[in-house]
Amino acid sequence: MSERPKTLPPTLRDKKRYIAFKVISENQFNKDEIKEAIWNACLRTLGELGTAKAKPWLIKFDETTQTGIIRCDRNHVYDVIFSLTLVSDINGNKAIIKVLGVSGTIKRLKRKFLSQFGWR
């Protein structure tokens, strides 16, 4: 009786981009601290509506190399990058987020920007 709703074809889905980044700081941070810092930075610079449109989402974060991947909407990549560059501290500790690059797939992002940090 309860039928599953039809999924959207790939041509109608939102296009995504993946951003590789590295946290530069004297301290080590965990995934939750980075997620909160990214979210707060986007809310501060883009506002609630802009953040909702950009859809920033932390996909993966490696705590040993302090590198990670963020997914966002294709049309708002530079808005998210702008927000990340304005991060100056995380939980009261001085830190900056350096964007390594942008790609359309996670596989290509790892191969191109994160392979030097041991990502496979």
Swiss-Prot record:
GO terms for biological process: tRNA 5'-leader removal. It comes from the Archaea. Pfam families: RNase_P_Rpp14 (PF01900). It is found in: Cytoplasm. It catalyses: Endonucleolytic cleavage of RNA, removing 5'-extranucleotides from tRNA precursor. Coiled coil: none annotated. GO terms for molecular function: ribonuclease P activity. Disulfide bonds: none annotated. One of its GO terms (cellular component) is ribonuclease P complex. Its EC number is 3.1.26.5. Gene3D superfamilies: Ribonuclease P, Pop5 subunit (3.30.70.3250). InterPro entries: Pop5/Rpp14/Rnp2-like (IPR002759), Rnp2-like_sf (IPR038085), Rnp2_archaea (IPR016434). Keywords: Cytoplasm, Endonuclease, Hydrolase, Nuclease, tRNA processing. Belongs to the eukaryotic/archaeal RNase P protein component 2 family. Consists of a catalytic RNA component and at least 4-5 protein subunits. Forms a subcomplex with Rnp3 which stimulates the catalytic RNA. Part of ribonuclease P, a protein complex that generates mature tRNA molecules by cleaving their 5'-ends. The RNA is catalytic, but its KM for pre-tRNA is 170-fold decreased in the presence of the 4 known protein subunits (Rnp1-4). The protein subunits also decrease the amount of Mg(2+) needed for activity. HAMAP family: RNase_P_2. This is Ribonuclease P protein component 2. The gene is rnp2.
